[in-house]
């Protein structure tokens, strides 16, 4: 078992790759009142087009299949659902699908070994029948229809549709109604057999645990299972243009107060994908659009917005920044956001203050087993090297104001997409 020292924080994460290929990460905290376990598959909604080792065929599956499989995987061969198993243990379980991966997780206070056994058993013991697929299809179709009436959901995906040409993040994680109708049991089996393999998965166990004993038990459970040869699926690479799809669109939705989004698409070569750059960019955005920013407080005091937020995402060859607001004055607020983007700034005092706050948040993160689990997942999925960022505290400590100013000068505003959602006309 390898020990990963989280430098400067006096924390340790234990790691081992099992013979099956499963990566296991464990973090102990005897002060925690509970444990959190996640079993994660490196398969998300964007991975619909792929090739298999030794197979010349290019596979292209319907959008939404990762989410469909996540739902379907809760069914048990003897009838019932995985929820029934965990209810007996008093354990909360759930799952989610993102663009990049699928996670099956649980939280509890007792019977850790039984919980681990049940989790590994139900995820690695698939039971797919045409009847179950069709039953689940009906449930997912209803979920998708509800999403069509959810303004936040519609607005979220519309931003990506207007920004991305080829990147599959411009498609709904759940898929369209037609996608859901077209997913077959053969599609489900193809994805499960090739992506739900220990070589393409990792497990994270955090909280009130004994790392050594937990690892031994996970090994024992995994050694009792048989897996086919891993075919190393290769997801098709795309070349995403730097331009946005639409520079402006106005739509209607079930909102009382209009929503606006100003979305900036920046080529990654302008801001190379490094942990340091991600932190610096977040610091700059917090300073200009965050909760304590002068710009946000000014808009709220003048009652121009009821809310203002920002987000940033790395997608294929580009960095996407969204500035979102709820406002009765959409055109005016879009104009003000554009003006602010053209005059981004950060003072040395504010930079140092936000740097200290971020370091404090990093320390407090290790008080919560679920937060630590989520943080490890994020590092494995989203970091450039797909591994735990063990020197994160050092990176924060060594950030300089001069680096922030340099990165600020590289933020390119050539490609902007504006989206406005106004209330439906009565």
Tell where the protein language model's regions lie, with residue ranges.
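His/Glu-rich zincin catalytic helix
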Residues: 1-81, 192-298, 416-426
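A common structural junction motif
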Residues: 121-130, 221-229, 339-348
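M16 family metallopeptidases and their MPP-like homologs
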Residues: 27, 34-48, 81-122, 156-178, ...
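Short, low-order "capping/linker" segments at domain edges
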Residues: 145-150, 244-256, 360-376, 380
């Amino acid at each position: 078992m390898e020990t990963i020292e989280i430098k400067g924080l006096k924390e340790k994460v234990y790691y081992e790759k099992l013979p099956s290929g499963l990566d296991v990460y464990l973090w102990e905290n005897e002060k925690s009142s509970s444990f959190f376990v996640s079993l994660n598959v490196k398969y998300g909604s964007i991975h619909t087009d792929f090739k298999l080792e030794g197979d010349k065929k290019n596979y292209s599956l319907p959008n939404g299949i990762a989410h469909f499989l996540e739902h379907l995987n809760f069914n048990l061969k003897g009838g019932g659902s995985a929820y029934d198993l965990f209810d007996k243990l008093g354990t909360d379980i759930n799952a989610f699908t993102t663009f990049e991966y699928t996670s099956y997780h649980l939280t509890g206070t007792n019977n850790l070994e039984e919980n681990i056994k049940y989790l590994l058993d139900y995820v690695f013991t698939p039971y797919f029948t045409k009847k179950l697929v069709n039953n689940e299809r009906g449930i997912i179709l209803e979920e998708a229809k509800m999403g069509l009436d959810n303004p936040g959901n519609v607005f979220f995906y519309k931003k990506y549709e207007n920004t991305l040409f080829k990147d599959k993040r411009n498609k709904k994680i759940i898929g369209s109604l037609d996608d859901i109708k077209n997913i077959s049991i053969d599609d489900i089996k193809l994805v499960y057999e090739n992506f739900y393999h220990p070589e393409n998965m990792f497990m994270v166990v955090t909280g009130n645990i004994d790392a050594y004993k937990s690892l031994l038990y996970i090994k024992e459970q995994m050694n009792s299972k048989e897996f086919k040869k891993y075919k190393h699926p290769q997801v098709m690479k795309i070349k995403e243009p730097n331009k946005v799809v639409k520079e402006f669109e106005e739509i209607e939705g079930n909102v009382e107060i209009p929503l606006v989004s100003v979305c900036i698409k920046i080529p990654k070569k302008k801001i190379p994908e490094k942990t340091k750059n991600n932190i610096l960019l977040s610091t700059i955005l917090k300073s200009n659009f965050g909760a304590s920013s002068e710009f946000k407080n000014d808009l709220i005091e003048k009652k121009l917005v009821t809310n203002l937020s920002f987000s940033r995402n790395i997608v294929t060859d580009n960095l996407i920044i969204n500035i979102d607001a709820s406002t009765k004055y959409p055109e005016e607020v879009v104009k003000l956001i554009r003006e602010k983007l053209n005059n981004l700034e950060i003072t040395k005092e504010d930079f140092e203050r936000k740097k200290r706050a971020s370091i404090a948040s990093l320390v407090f993160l290790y008080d919560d087993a679920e937060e630590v689990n989520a943080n490890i997942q994020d590092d494995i999925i989203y970091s450039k090297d797909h591994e735990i960022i063990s020197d994160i505290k050092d990176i924060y400590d060594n950030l300089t104001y001069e680096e922030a100013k340099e990165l600020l000068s590289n933020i390119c505003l050539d490609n902007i997409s504006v989206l406005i959602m106004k209330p439906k006309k009565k």
